[in-house]
Amino acid sequence: MDEIINKYQAVEKLFKEIQQGLAAYDQYKTLISEMMHYNNHIKQEYFNFLMIISPYLIRAHSGETLRNKVNNEIKRLILVENINTKISKTLVSVNFLLQKKLSTDGVKTKNMWCTNNPMLQVKTAHNLFKQLCDTQSKTQWVQTLKYKECKYCHTDMVFNTTQFGLQCPNCGCIQELMGTIFDETHFYNHDGQKAKSGIFNPNRHYRFWIEHILGRNPEQELGTKQDPCGTKVLQQLKKIIKRDNKCIALLTVENIRKMLKEINRTDLNNCVSLILRKLTGVGPPQISESILLRGEYIFTEAIKIREKVCKKGRINRNYYPYYIYKIFDAILPPNDTTNRRILQYIHLQGNDTLANNDSEWESICMELPEIKWKPTDRTHCVHFF
């Protein structure tokens, strides 16, 4: 517990130092505003953490015999609530902002912001902040920016109509084209009505499903008006687990979906990853932002190609988790067993539908050089719990 508190305090000190150090520079007002957003977010997370553990702290001082039991319960809560990941996710965003600003100022930096260690991320952010301050003490020359070159991988970027800018095909970084007017006629149909956003903006579908597959969706989604926190649902599932003598550590997505069907709560099928984390204490792998961005770029391209090559007469709607499964199965190395656990949290449809999806995916891969086609193997996922 002390380790978590130290991490929160280190992050708070970092934000304060950045705010004070950059306040004198007008060009950093936007950056400071974004930093304050993350600062407020981390303070709220810290408050929530203290609220969760406060009852246990009171019990810890009530008697020596309870202390070990209480400490173990606090450790379990830290794991279940994913505290370290929440801190790390905020710091990843902060370091990305600092690194992006340095690159805009013409300063080359090493891409170190994807580490999952919060204390190393604080150190990285501090070093980036010092570099940012140092650039102000040097003479600033007007530079010609190479808009078509990615700032991080130095590869040629391609135009992305959904993001109104350029996007790197390697890391997924987006370069906004300032002061550019776009022709928006392709966003409207012949009747003058705006087209469905799902066709021209697949990014929002990707982000929705990634959030749910990684169990990052709000816990309030499990609740109802009568049961805001979803406590009743979790209790019902625990009763079924006990009744069927299931091993909690070996629960799968399919197990949870069957149990949800039994209690007539299939509306929570999208929340299976979150439920698994709440029940087992083990959540999906925390994929780095660089990999997620690359996945988003490939996903966007795949959906665009699908609209062109989809078979006529097929009425099945896009099942976006299938695309996410195929993309991560392709871009994650076979020996990366930690990150490849994400495949275990993606539900695949029935055999007939899966065969049709594979056939369609093969057509997409012919125009998608980033992905090499291979048939889906249901037995490919091995449990690493």
Curated annotation (Swiss-Prot):
The keyword 4Fe-4S does not apply. The keyword Zinc applies. Keywords: Late protein, Metal-binding, Zinc, Zinc-finger. A zinc finger (C2H2-type) spans 166-190. GO terms for biological process: regulation of viral transcription. Induction: Expressed in the late phase of the viral replicative cycle. GO terms for molecular function: zinc ion binding. It comes from the Viruses. Belongs to the asfivirus B385R family. This is Zinc finger protein B385R.
